[in-house]
From Swiss-Prot:
It comes from Homo sapiens. One of its GO terms (biological process) is plasma membrane tubulation. A 1,2-diacyl-sn-glycero-3-phospho-(1D-myo-inositol-4,5-bisphosphate) binds at R312, K314, R352. Residues 90-102 have a biased composition (Pro residues). This is Sorting nexin-18. Residues 135-149 have a biased composition (Polar residues). It is a peripheral membrane protein.
Length: 628
């Protein structure tokens, strides 16, 4: 029979390639083998794509009856040797099995799954029971390990003949980690759905990892994890999830702290005490290796050092990648577009230089980005004369520990009243609507201005020149009449024709005076607007993980089925700032107790000495009813 599964929860797709599920919906699976917690299948509406494996329960065929029941195995009961021998007979693959799409074939080639056997371990009734071995991410994705690169690699990379910079690669391992951060080949499917290190410790399993307790009798208990199932979401990749789960650790130096102050219009970054500007001049074509490699070099002169440095576009691209990785909640404007052909043409060089000037003006005026070490290294280190210092600064930036989850440790917020989460969420939603509307409006204005500028350069100029040409033709006609009294009239008509030609040229030059700067500024803003959806996703993600942690911990207790989903803690601990700061200690000291009289859980977090701000034992009742 075809592989089928039943949806245990509603799931709304957020990314391309995913499909939405409805609770109790029956789906057709393309393969029972999951890839990093995701299965591929077709829902009841005919949509094919990926969905979380823990959101569904595989519908398995009933086991064949024993030989004594008169089933197919009855004749073998009286034989000395079973017909199939003592080894279990392999079961043929289901008839409706379809190979995964091409995108997954390459991933599955390193290790092919063996055909299913008639033997099933005791936990096989559950989708992830039985502890079937799953291929490790290294095997599944080819085991590619990204290298940090040596000094020779650095020379090869930055001496490429193309001015189009390589796409920034991911640091560290190229394999996708498991949900619990492990990537060993022997970890089973159940082991890859651990709650988290902190939550496991909070339940008393400090000696090692404890897989979730799955209970086939309660389907709801099979799919609750504390982590975001979409491991490719911005909230996960930026380190926001790891931070709110208390997995960020690192020593923050005073120079690395980013201070937020209360300004006249609300919270804002602390201003740069030493503002500066930077000019970009003299784009020149340079060659090396006896002309075999060519590139465009720009001269940068920051006002606070007055020392010129020369940078290629690939250097700008490298800087952008480092800043975007280090500051997940700060919008780093996009660089001017790349171009593979015609990059040495005068018009393209001039246009790119103007775009880099806009980009540099914004970066130098930003209170946080302008003071960043990697940005200052980019502006002040003369790579052509001190190559060793340049490489040291590059390696330091690429090995920066204050990235990802640790970045949030560097934020220093002012002492203020507790934030109302509902008000915070309302403001974020309002800003989200504003950015969406502004993005659409900026795109429309850019299109309209570009079309109008094109008409001025071509259409208007051509039309005025036609009128001027007509007047000059009339003047030439009058010149055929050699009467003395018509000389002044002929000159006036010719002057009118020349005036129309000049007006046409003015129309062609006008966009450079007004519309081109507006469109350049719009391009910068469009880069910001493209960044805001990911930043908003990170901001909104920090508002709910505390509730999700509580929910996940409770679901782990004795396989209990929680029938009431709404959870919230008391107002004293519902502020985003307080939760983000103390969630690590809170989860470590978490104790859950069952109140038999009311059938509800009471959550208790204990004071751990003077290290944390808990002055006494506090009990937070959760509005959750348990059914066993």
């Amino acid at each position: 029979m075809a592989l089928r599964a039943r949806a245990l929860y509603d799931f709304r797709s957020e990314n391309p390639g995913e499909i939405s599920l409805r609770e109790h919906e029956v789906l057709s699976l393309c393969s029972e083998q999951d890839i990093e917690g995701w299965l591929e299948g077709v829902n009841s509406r005919g949509d094919r794509g990926l969905f979380p494996a823990s959101y569904v329960q595989v519908i398995r065929a009933p086991e064949p009856g024993p030989a004594g029941d008169g089933g197919p195995g009855a004749p073998a009961r009286y034989a000395n040797v079973p017909p199939g021998g003592f080894e279990p007979l392999p079961v043929a693959p289901p008839a409706s099995f379809k190979p995964p799409p091409d995108a997954f074939q390459a991933l599955l080639q390193p290790q092919q799954a063996p055909p299913p056997s008639t033997f099933q371990p005791p936990g096989a009734g559950f989708p992830y029971g039985g502890g079937a071995l799953q291929p490790s991410p290294q095997q599944l994705y080819g085991g590619y390990q990204a290298s940090q690169g040596s000094d020779d690699d650095w020379d090869d990379e930055w001496d490429d003949s193309s001015t189009v910079a390589d796409e920034p690669g991911a640091l560290g391992s190229g394999a996708y980690p498991d949900l619990d951060g492990s990537s060993s080949a022997g970890v089973g499917a159940a082991g890859r759905y651990r709650l988290s290190t902190r939550s496991d410790l909070s339940l008393g399993s400090r000696g090692g990892s404890v897989p979730p307790q799955h209970h086939p009798s309660g389907p709801k208990s099979s799919a609750t994890v504390s982590r975001n199932l979409n491991r490719f979401s911005t909230f996960v990749k930026s380190g926001g999830e790891a931070f709110v789960l208390g997995e960020a650790s690192g020593f923050v130096k005073d120079g690395d702290k980013l201070c937020v102050v209360l300004g006249p219009y609300g919270p804002e970054w602390q201003e740069n005490p030493y503002p500066f500007q930077c000019t970009i001049d003299d784009p020149t074509k340079q060659t090396k290796f006896k002309g075999m490699k060519s590139y465009i070099s720009y001269k940068l002169v920051p006002t606070h050092t007055q020392v010129p440095v020369h940078r290629r576009y690939k250097h700008f691209d490298w800087l952008y990648a480092r800043l975007a990785e280090k500051f997940p909640v700060i919008s780093v404007p996009h660089l001017p577009e790349k171009q593979a052909t015609g990059r040495f043409e005068e018009d393209f060089i001039s246009k790119r230089r103007k775009g880099l000037i806009w980009w540099m003006n914004h970066m130098a005026s930003h209170p946080v980005l302008a003071q960043c070490d990697v940005f200052q290294h980019f502006l002040t280190c003369p790579s052509s004369t001190d190559e060793k210092a340049w490489k040291q600064g590059k390696r330091k930036a690429e090995k920066d520990e204050m990235v990802g989850a640790n970045f949030f440790l560097t934020l220093s917020t002012p002492p203020a009243a507790a934030l109302d989460l509902q008000e915070v969420e309302s403001k974020i939603d309002g800003f989200k609507c504003f950015t969406k509307k502004m993005d659409d409006s900026a795109l429309q204005l850019n299109h309209t201005a570009n079309e109008f500028a094109r008409k001025q350069v071509t259409g208007f100029k051509k039309e005025y020149q036609k009128v001027g040409q007509s007047f000059r033709g009339l003047s030439q006609a009058f010149e055929l009449d050699q009467q003395a009294f018509s000389v002044g009239l002929n000159q006036a008509i010719a002057f009118t024709g020349d005036a129309y030609d000049a007006i046409g040229e003015l129309f062609a030059e006008q966009p450079r005076q007004d519309l081109d700067p507006v469109m350049d500024l719009l391009a910068l803003y469009q880069g910001h607007l493209a960044n805001f959806p990911d930043i908003i996703h990170v901001q909104k993600g920090k508002a709910w993980p505390l509730e999700q942690v509580i929910w996940s911990v409770l679901c782990r207790l004795k396989g209990a089925t929680l029938t009431a989903v709404p959870l919230w803690v008391s107002e004293s601990y519902s502020t985003g700032e307080e939760a983000s700061r103390d969630v690590d200690a809170w989860v470590f000291s978490l104790e859950c107790k069952l109140d038999c009289s009311t059938g509800s859980f009471l959550l208790e977090y204990l004071a751990l000495g003077n290290e944390y701000s808990f002055s006494k034992v506090q009990r937070v009742p959760l509005m959750t009813v348990l059914s066993f």
